[in-house]
């Protein structure tokens, strides 16, 4: 729901969801979008459901909003290297390899969103925004270390 709100409030933003597996991320996203659109029909009206615009497949989904924003799922693998997004959500980060996250996923967020007037604002809250969602893990794992880093930082 957070990504949907960001897509509505920030035109032309590009966001992503990733997880340990690409199919897992796509399944989570599709399930939650359908649930939210059922509970709050206004969200369904903001998504462009036109043919070939919003895509839903077995291991990929992309939701395009009427203001040009979108969010999709990307794989937590080397094949995602070089993609560019403004922010993202790491779902079940306990299952994501810390090296891949640091070297491939986080660098995808190195671009600033272009506003409707064509300007960019590097200090904008959306840029490089990271949301981590996971179940309880163990000490000395990447998610635990990341939590401590964010709490202390």
Feature map (PLM): residue ranges:
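Phosphate/NTP-binding elements of NTP-utilizing enzymes
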Residues: 1-153
């Amino acid at each position: 729901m957070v990504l949907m709100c960001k897509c509505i409030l920030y035109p032309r933003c590009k966001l992503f969801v990733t997880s340990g597996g690409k199919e897992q991320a796509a399944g989570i996203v599709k399930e939650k979008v359908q649930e939210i659109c059922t509970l709050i029909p206004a969200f369904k009206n903001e998504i462009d459901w036109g043919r070939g615009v919003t895509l839903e497949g077995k291991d990929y989904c992309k939701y395009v909003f009427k203001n040009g924003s979108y969010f999709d799922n990307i794989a937590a693998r080397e094949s995602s290297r070089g993609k560019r997004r403004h922010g993202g959500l790491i779902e079940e980060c306990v299952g994501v390899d810390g090296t891949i996250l640091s070297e491939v996923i986080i660098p995808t967020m190195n671009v600033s969103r272009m506003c409707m007037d064509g300007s960019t604002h590097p200090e904008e809250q959306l840029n490089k925004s990271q949301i981590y969602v996971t179940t309880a893990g163990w000490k000395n794992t990447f998610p635990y270390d990341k939590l401590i880093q964010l709490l202390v930082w």
